[in-house]
Amino acid sequence: TEIEALIGRMPGLPIPAEAETLLRRDIHARLLALQKMHPKYEGIGQMIQTAEQAIGQVKPESEERLLETARLEQFSRLSKEISWLLKEERLLTPVSDSVREQLMTKLEFRRVETAYHHHIRQAERLIKGQQLHQAQWYCSQMKTLLEPWSHSNKQAAGWYQEVLKLCKRVSSGLKGEAQSKGSSSN
C-alpha cells in the first residue's frame, strides 16, 4: 500500500517515531477493516498479527541530521507526504486535531533542522574554497528558512544568529574580493 511504501522509505531518515507509529496503526486499521469486509480473505489473520507486532517494534527516530543532498531531498519529500496525509485526513486511524498539529509542526521543524545542517555545512565548505558567491546563496536559503521559526523557537533563533554571522563573513569576503579586483585593475 501507499502507507507501507512510505514506511519503507523511512530507515535512516529523521522521521519522528510518532509518525511511523501512526502510519503502522493505520495499516493495522486498514487490515481490520478488510477483515470485516472479507472475513475469509486468505492470510488476513497473519497480516493483522504482523501489523500489530510492527507497531510495537517502531525504533526511535534516527538522530542523523547531517544528510547528503539526495537524502535531504528524499527526507523532505517523505515528510511532506506524511504531512499531507495528516492535513487531508487520509488516514483510517483517528487523529485528534492537537496531535495532527503537533506532528505536522514536528515534521516541518525537522525539515528546517536538517536543511539548516546541510546548508551550513555546504556554506562553510564553499567559504573555505573561496567560492563566496555560492556560499552567499546558501546563506540566503538559510535566512529564508529560519527567519519564520526564529521568533518562536529558541533553537531556530540561535541558528538564525549563527547564519547572520556567517552571512556577514561571506559579505565581508565578497567586499574584500571586489576591492582587490578594483585595485588590481588600476
Where is each model-derived feature located?
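Alpha-helical oligomerization segments
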Residues: 119, 123-186
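Soluble C-terminal extramembrane regulatory/interaction domains of multi-pass membrane proteins
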Residues: 90-134
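N-terminal topogenic membrane-targeting module
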Residues: 1-70
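Inward-facing hydrophobic residues that define packing positions of alpha-helical scaffold repeats
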Residues: 24-27, 79-82, 86, 127, ...
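Short, charge-rich, low-complexity alpha-helical interaction segments
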Residues: 70-103
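Helix-turn-helix repeat elements of alpha-solenoid scaffolds
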Residues: 16-26, 90-98, 139-140
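TPR/TPR-like alpha-solenoid helical repeat scaffolds
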Residues: 44-59, 98-109, 152-177
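Hydrophobic/aromatic side-chain positions at a characteristic register within alpha-helices
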Residues: 7, 67-70, 74, 115, ...
